[in-house]
C-alpha cells in the first residue's frame, strides 16, 4: 500500500507541512490500514473505549461506583518502564553519561527503522497532537505522538492537553517534538488480534539534539505515553539545559497557613517514597490547608521578579494503585471515584469494581491482573501487579489549586529532596545554601523497593530522583543546577530541604507517623522560610529539635521523634565512602562545586560527636 492509498492521509485537519510530511513518511514506513488524526473530544474517548471493550482490552467498570471508567490487563511481559531498554542517543557518548544507555544515533535509527518497517499493518495509525503544560503559555511545549495503540490515545487524553486545540497551537510551521510509538505487533490478513499487543523486542529511545522520541514494542505507561517521562523529563531536561530552566521529577504542593498565606513547595522523591501522598496532603494541624498542583513533574522557569516559577506539564495523575487507600491518600481516592479513569493491572471484583493490595476490605474472590481466578487466603500471588496504575484527570481532584492551569506558574519557596532510609538521615534537614542543597540532592540515596529494578533494601543513589530520567550527562545535569544558582539572586531562590519519613528504631518500627502528620514538618519548613523557627546547626545542615516542631495533638512518643531527628556523626562518617563511590561513578564531569561540598562535609564530620 502506498501513502496515496492509505485512507485518512489526504484528509488531515492541518496545513502544517512539517507535520504532514512526517506523517506521510511514517505511514509509508509502517504501512497502517488507515490514518486517523485524534481530536481529543469526549466522543472520541467514548468511541475508542467502546472499541477497546469489544477487543477485550478494556472491561467497563460498575458505572455507579466508577462512572465512565475502564480496566485494562496488560501482557505479563509488559508491566513497567524498562530502564535496560531505554536509550539516550546523543551525538556524543559522553553527553549521555554513565547513568544512561547509549547507542550511536545513526546506528539506532537504522536498527529501529528496520523494526518499524510494516509494523502497523492491520492497525490504525493515530496522529495525536498534544501540549505539555498550559495551552496559553508564552512558549507552549508541543508534541505529536504517532501511535498504533487505542489505549495510548485514550490515556493521552487524560494525561495531556490533547487534540484539536494543541494542533491549532502549532499553526502552519510551529515546532513540535516528534514522538513515534508502535506496539510492534503487525497483523496479517485474517489474523486475530490479542487484547494487549506488544513485542518481545523493546526500545525506548531519545534523540536529545533533534528532540525526537522513538518507542517500539511496549504498550505500557511511560514506555508508550510519550508525553510523560520521555518528553516531560528526558527531552525537556535537555531543552531546559539549553534554555536556562529546570525540568524535574517533582510534585508541586500549595500550603496555606492559618493567616491565609500561600507557600508553594516542589519536592523530588524516588518511586515509592510518598510523592503522590505529599502532593495530596491533608494537614492534621488546625488552620493549615493544602492544595495540589501536581504529583510527578515540575517545570521551573525564572519569572521577571527573579524567582523560580513552576508549572505542572501534565493534565492527569498516573499513580501507583497498591497502597493507595482512604487512610494514606483520601484525595487520590476521591479523584478516582469521580470516574473517567483508566486502571491498568489492578484486580476486578465480582460486582465490577476494582481492588488492589492496601485497599480496605478483603474480597473473597477476584479476577487478578493476569485474568485468573483469585481467592482470599488461598491464592499466593498478589491480586494487583505491584506497579498497577490509575490514570485519572487532575481536574477531578477535590483539592486542586485554582492556579493549576496558570501559564505563569507559581513561585516556589522551598525545594524538598527525600528518600527512604531506615537509618542515618534525619526527618528533616535544611541545606546551608543553594550549592549545598544541590549537593544533598545530587547525592540522594534511597533504599530500593519493588517499584525499581535492583535488590530490595540496597541504597541506590538517585540524583534529584532523576536517575532514570536525565536526558543528558549526570555531571552536566548537576552543574546546570549549580549554574541556576550562580546566575541568579540567591536571596530569591527557594530554600532547599531534605526529608526522610521512613527512619526506623532499633525495634524496626517507624519513628514518625507520616501521612497527614507530615504537615508538622512542612510547617517547620515554612517557618524557617519566614525566619520564625529554630533549629540546630549540625555537620549536615540545620535540623529541628523536638521543641522546634509543632507536636500538639500528635499521638507519638517524644523519644521516637527525637530519635527521628538525630544526627549520628559516626553513621554519617560511614555514609561518606558510599557518597564518594557515587561521585567517582559520575566521573570526569563531576562539578568542582560538588567535590568542594563533599570535602567540606568530611571536614565538618571529622571532629563531630
UniProtKB/Swiss-Prot annotation:
Cofactor details (free text): Binds 1 Mn(2+) ion per subunit.
Gene3D superfamilies: 3.90.228.20, Phosphoenolpyruvate Carboxykinase, domain 1, Phosphoenolpyruvate Carboxykinase, domain 2
EC number: 4.1.1.32
One GO biological process term: gluconeogenesis
Names of required cofactors: Mn(2+)
Record-linked PROSITE patterns: PEPCK_GTP (PS00505)
Keyword terms: Cytoplasm, Decarboxylase, Gluconeogenesis, GTP-binding, Lyase, Manganese, Metal-binding, Nucleotide-binding
Entry GO terms, CC: cytosol
Catalytic activity: oxaloacetate + GTP = phosphoenolpyruvate + GDP + CO2
Tagged with keyword Cell division: no
Cell location: Cytoplasm
InterPro entries: PEP_carboxykin_GTP_CS, PEP_carboxykinase_C, PEP_carboxykinase_GTP, PEP_carboxykinase_GTP_C, PEP_carboxykinase_GTP_N, PEP_carboxykinase_N
Keyword Lyase: yes
UniProt GO MF annotations: GTP binding; manganese ion binding; phosphoenolpyruvate carboxykinase (GTP) activity
CDD domains with a match to the protein in the record: PEPCK_GTP
NCBIfam families named among the record's database cross-references: PRK04210.1
Subunit structure, interactors included: Monomer.
Name recorded for this polypeptide: Phosphoenolpyruvate carboxykinase [GTP]
Organism: Mycobacterium marinum (strain ATCC BAA-535 / M)
Organism phylogeny: Bacteria, Bacillati, Actinomycetota, Actinomycetes, Mycobacteriales
Gene: pckG
Amino acid at each position: 500500500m502506498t501513502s496515496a492509498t492509505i485512507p485518512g492521509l489526504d484528509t488531515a485537519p492541518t496545513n502544517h507541512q512539517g507535520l504532514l510530511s512526517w506523517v506521510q513518511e511514517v505511514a509509508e514506513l509502517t504501512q497502517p490500514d488507515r490514518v486517523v488524526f485524534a481530536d481529543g473530544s469526549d466522543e472520541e474517548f467514548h468511541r475508542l473505549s467502546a472499541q477497546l471493550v469489544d477487543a477485550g482490552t478494556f472491561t467497563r467498570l460498575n458505572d455507579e461506583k466508577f462512572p465512565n471508567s475502564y480496566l485494562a490487563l496488560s501482557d505479563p511481559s509488559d508491566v513497567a518502564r524498562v530502564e535496560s531498554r531505554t536509550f539516550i542517543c546523543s551525538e556524543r557518548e559522553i553527553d549521555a553519561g554513565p547513568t544512561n544507555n547509549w547507542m550511536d544515533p545513526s546506528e539506532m535509527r537504522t536498527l529501529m527503522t528496520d523494526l518499524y518497517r510494516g509494523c502497523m499493518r492491520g492497525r490504525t495509525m493515530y496522529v495525536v497532537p498534544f501540549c505539555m503544560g498550559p495551552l496559553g503559555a508564552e512558549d507552549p511545549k508541543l508534541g505529536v505522538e504517532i501511535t498504533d495503540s487505542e489505549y495510548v490515545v485514550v490515556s493521552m487524553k487524560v494525561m495531556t492537553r490533547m487534540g484539536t486545540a494543541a494542533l491549532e497551537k502549532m499553526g502552519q510551521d510551529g515546532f513540535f517534538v516528534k514522538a513515534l510509538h508502535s506496539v510492534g505487533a503487525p497483523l496479517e490478513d485474517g489474523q486475530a488480534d490479542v487484547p494487549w499487543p506488544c513485542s518481545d523486542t523493546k526500545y525506548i529511545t531519545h534523540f536529545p539534539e533533534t528532540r525526537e522520541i522513538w518507542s517500539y514494542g511496549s504498550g505500557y505507561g511511560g514506555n508508550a505515553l510519550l508525553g510523560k517521562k520521555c518528553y516531560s523529563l528526558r527531552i525537556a531536561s535537555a531543552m531546559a539545559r539549553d534554555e536556562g530552566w529546570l525540568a524535574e521529577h517533582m510534585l508541586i504542593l500549595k500550603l496555606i497557613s492559618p493567616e491565609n498565606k500561600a507557600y508553594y513547595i516542589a519536592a523530588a522523591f524516588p518511586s515509592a517514597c510518598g510523592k503522590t501522598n505529599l502532593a495530596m496532603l491533608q494537614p492534621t494541624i488546625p488552620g493549615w490547608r493544602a492544595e495540589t498542583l501536581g504529583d510527578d513533574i515540575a517545570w521551573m522557569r525564572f519569572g521577571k521578579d527573579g524567582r523560580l516559577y513552576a508549572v505542572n506539564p501534565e493534565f492527569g495523575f498516573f499513580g501507583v494503585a497498591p497502597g493507595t487507600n482512604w487512610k494514606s491518600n483520601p484525595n487520590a481516592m476521591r479523584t478516582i471515584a469521580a470516574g473517567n479513569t483508566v486502571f491498568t493491572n489492578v484486580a476486578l471484583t465480582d460486582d465490577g469494581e476494582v481492588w488492589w493490595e492496601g485497599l480496605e476490605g478483603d474480597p473473597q474472590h477476584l479476577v487478578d491482573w493476569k485474568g485468573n481466578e483469585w481467592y482470599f487466603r488461598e491464592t499466593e500471588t498478589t491480586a494487583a501487579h505491584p506497579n498497577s496504575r490509575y490514570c485519572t484527570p487532575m481536574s477531578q481532584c477535590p483539592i486542586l489549586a485554582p492556579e493549576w492551569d496558570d501559564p505563569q506558574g507559581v513561585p516556589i519557596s522551598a525545594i524538598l529532596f527525600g528518600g527512604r532510609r531506615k537509618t542515618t538521615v534525619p526527618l528533616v534537614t535544611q541545606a546551608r545554601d543553594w550549592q549545598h542543597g544541590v549537593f544533598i540532592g545530587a547525592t540522594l540515596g534511597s533504599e530500593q523497593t519493588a517499584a525499581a529494578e535492583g535488590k530490595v533494601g540496597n541504597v541506590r543513589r538517585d540524583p534529584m530522583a532523576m536517575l532514570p530520567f536525565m536526558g543528558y550527562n549526570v555531571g552536566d545535569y548537576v552543574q546546570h543546577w549549580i549554574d541556576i544558582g550562580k546566575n541568579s539572586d540567591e536571596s530569591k531562590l527557594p530554600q532547599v530541604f531534605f526529608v526522610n519519613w521512613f527512619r526506623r528504631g532499633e525495634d524496626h518500627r517507624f519513628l514518625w507517623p507520616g501521612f497527614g502528620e507530615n504537615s508538622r514538618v512542612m510547617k517547620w519548613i515554612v517557618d524557617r522560610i519566614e525566619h520564625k523557627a529554630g533549629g540546630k546547626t549540625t555537620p549536615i545542615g540545620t535540623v529541628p529539635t523536638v521543641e522546634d516542631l509543632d507536636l500538639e495533638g500528635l499521638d507519638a512518643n517524644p523519644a521516637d521523634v527525637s530519635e527521628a531527628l538525630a544526627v549520628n556523626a559516626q553513621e554519617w562518617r560511614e555514609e561518606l565512602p558510599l557518597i564518594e563511590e557515587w561521585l567517582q561513578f559520575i566521573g570526569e564531569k563531576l562539578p568542582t562545586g560538588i567535590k568542594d561540598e563533599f570535602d567540606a562535609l568530611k571536614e565538618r564530620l571529622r571532629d563531630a560527636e
